[in-house]
């Protein structure tokens, strides 16, 4: 640590922060012009450049967000109204006035002091700050860009090599967890591990998959292109406690989103209109939703967009649109599984279902559990449990045991409308033919009478292609497509 800065007249600046700034200013000799030009002309532009050099690790301007960001307590935060950056500019002005007294040449000292005195006028500072937006510009995509970094209260954890280091403003992290990490890799939370055993009813395969899935959610990438559904028909089954604990622990990295984000029925927005929910998901890792009576069907297009890893373009209110690569994993909690009208969600394995069959009876319920799990020492242990889950994920991926996979198979079959239609209204018949158009019309009548979603003709034919085992072949006759080996049942 260098000594505190001492001025020519013997004044010692005992604040380490301001002392370091004075040393930096003195090393730059901003008053020099001509042959020994410092590069900082005696103008608002020059002062904007000098301010940018001194505060580049503390203040940045993002044009897409129309906002300044300032760095404090290990994270970059939006500076609403440019309040904090304006205070930094005031500090800068005071430091420059102190520096004027350090200039050896009398004439230059007087002239430079006269120039710096003008910065006492707020209007001049406003102009300097406006010029500094270019000096300190940052693109929105530069924030939270590293998918392996997790910013804790006391430092940054790197999933690439499982190391922990001091905060670095050059990481440009705007997110931060709600706990301070410990360097003890063996730290654990026994109560959390007991809770996991309880909600999985001692099923080690399910507990292991849950740990790997939650560990995978720490990673800011969409490698697996999937979402997770926690399904429990009973009440008091632990789903909310699990998700709420992870949300609290991850802090800024977690977001509770409306279920309309992934369901049909949500109002379709004009692509040019604001999409604040989507915009708010940039940089998030853990996005949770709860079922709603308003929505009952998953929207395959939305889910494919949000889980596919492709760029998302969104616009917050009163801001310009930004494009970002999703870093989040979707988690849906529900008592009743939502309907799925597009079987491709199952074929592409985008849906992972984890059943919560435990029901905590009144005498088994711990009303203090959520608060207990969210204590600092317990969140540290839970975080390392997730890290160990990430390590397991790196080794074994998201492979599911047969029992876990059977849950998804049952879910798929219960939503297979074409198969249900065939079983109820059709039968195999060797050599029989039916027009594809007539078969689709029969399906529409069946779907409407059963209150089911009516697939488009294109999707219906695609599903029939997937169920090629239900008929002999598909052919054309006089330009009309036919299905061979199938006929309609007689309804009595």
Positions of predicted regions on the chain:
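Modules that initiate DNA replication and primer synthesis
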Residues: 1-34, 66-97
């Amino acid at each position: 640590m260098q000594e505190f800065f001492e001025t020519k007249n013997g004044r010692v600046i005992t604040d380490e922060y301001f002392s370091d700034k004075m040393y930096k200013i003195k090393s730059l000799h901003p008053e020099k012009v001509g042959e020994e030009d410092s590069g900082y002309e005696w103008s608002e532009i020059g002062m904007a450049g000098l301010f940018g050099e001194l505060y580049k690790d503390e203040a940045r301007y993002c044009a897409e967000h129309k906002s300044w960001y300032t760095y404090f307590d290990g994270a970059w935060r939006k500076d609403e109204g440019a309040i904090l950056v304006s205070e930094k500019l005031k500090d800068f002005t005071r430091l420059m006035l102190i520096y004027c007294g350090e200039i050896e040449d009398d004439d230059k000292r007087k002239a430079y002091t006269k120039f710096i005195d003008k910065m006492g006028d707020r209007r001049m500072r406003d102009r300097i700050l406006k010029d500094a937006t270019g000096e300190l510009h940052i693109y929105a995509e530069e924030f939270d860009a590293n998918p392996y970094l997790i910013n804790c209260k006391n430092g940054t954890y790197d999933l690439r090599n499982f190391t922990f280091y001091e905060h670095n403003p050059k990481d440009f992290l705007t997110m931060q967890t709600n706990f301070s990490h410990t360097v003890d890799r063996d730290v654990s939370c026994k109560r959390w591990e007991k809770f996991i055993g309880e909600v999985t009813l001692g099923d080690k395969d399910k507990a292991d998959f849950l740990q790997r899935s939650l560990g995978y959610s720490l990673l800011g990438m969409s490698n697996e292109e999937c979402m997770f559904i926690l399904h429990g028909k009973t009440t008091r089954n632990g789903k909310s406690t699990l998700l709420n604990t992870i949300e609290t622990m991850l802090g800024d990295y977690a977001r509770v989103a409306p279920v309309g984000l992934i369901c049909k029925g949500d109002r379709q927005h004009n692509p040019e209109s604001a999409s604040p929910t989507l915009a708010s998901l940039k940089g998030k890792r853990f996005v949770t939703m709860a079922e709603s009576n308003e929505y009952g069907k998953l929207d395959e297009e939305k889910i494919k967009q949000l889980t596919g890893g492709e760029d998302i373009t969104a616009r917050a209110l009163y801001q310009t649109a930004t494009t970002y690569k999703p870093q989040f994993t979707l988690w849906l909690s529900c008592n009743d599984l939502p309907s799925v009208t597009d079987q491709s969600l199952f074929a592409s394995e985008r849906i992972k279902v984890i059943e919560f069959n435990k029901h905590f009876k009144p005498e088994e319920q711990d009303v203090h559990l959520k608060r207990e799990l969210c204590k600092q020492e317990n969140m540290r242990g839970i975080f390392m449990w997730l890290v160990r889950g990430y390590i397991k994920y790196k080794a074994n991926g998201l492979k599911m045991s047969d029992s876990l996979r059977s849950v998804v198979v049952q879910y798929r079959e219960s939503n297979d409308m074409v198969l249900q239609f065939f079983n109820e209204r059709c039968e195999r018949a060797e050599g029989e033919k039916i027009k594809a158009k007539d078969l689709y019309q029969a399906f529409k009548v069946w779907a409407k009478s059963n209150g089911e979603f009516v697939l488009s003709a294109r999707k219906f034919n695609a599903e029939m292609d997937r169920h090629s085992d239900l008929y002999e072949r598909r052919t054309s006759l006089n330009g009309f497509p036919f299905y061979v080996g199938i006929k309609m049942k007689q309804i009595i």
